[in-house]
Amino acid sequence: MIDYVGSFLGAYFLGFALFYGIGFFKSISNRII
């Protein structure tokens, strides 16, 4: 159960970090251009 919850939180955090990173990269690229 702990491993399942840990993997779920890890995947959720990774997806959130990826989404936030893409939005941050888009904002920087738009600001430069």
Curated annotation (Swiss-Prot):
Q: How does it sit in the membrane?
A: Single-pass membrane protein
Transmembrane regions: 5-25
Give the GO cellular component terms, alphabetically.
Answer: host cell membrane; membrane; virion component
Q: Which UniProt keywords apply?
A: Host membrane, Membrane, Transmembrane, Transmembrane helix, Virion
Q: Where in the cell is it found?
A: Virion; Host membrane
Q: What does this protein do?
A: May initiate with G7P the virion concomitant assembly-budding process, by interacting with the packaging signal of the viral genome. The assembly-budding takes place at the host inner membrane. In turn, G7P and G9P are present at the end of the filamentous virion that emerges first from the bacterial host.
Entry's family note: Belongs to the inovirus G9P protein family.
Q: What is this protein called?
A: Tail virion protein G9P
- Report the source organism: Salmonella phage IKe (Bacteriophage IKe)
Gene field: IX
